[in-house]
Amino acid sequence: MHPAVGRPALGVVGFSLGGYYGLGLACQKPKSIAAVVSFYATGRGKFAEAQAAFLGHFAEDDEFEAAADVAQLEQHIRQAGKPVAFYTYPGTKHWFFEPDRPEYDPAAAQLAWERTVGFLQRELLR
């Protein structure tokens, strides 16, 4: 980590494939990553080694992420003893957070944003 960062741990926010990489990064760099926010992405990793808290935002109708995979990831993180909160947004599709996409859902995006900001404040500003 660059010395200019000034904090011992970082938060990671990733969308789709970026969320997948964020989940993996928490396992690969546990001393550096304190919080992970994944938008519509699941992943694998040795979550017992992670030191992060996890927040996930998922679409109800996602052609790329099955609800069973989301539930399995949440269970895996929880069983590893890590703080985790996953939300599924009714009536949404993959990319619901991104205003330049046809799947954009303003109400769901606003709620996800509020949850994300609160989560990062709690986890990173303690």
Task: Name these PLM-found stretches.
Residues M1-R126:
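N-terminal cap/leader regions of alpha/beta-hydrolase-fold enzymes
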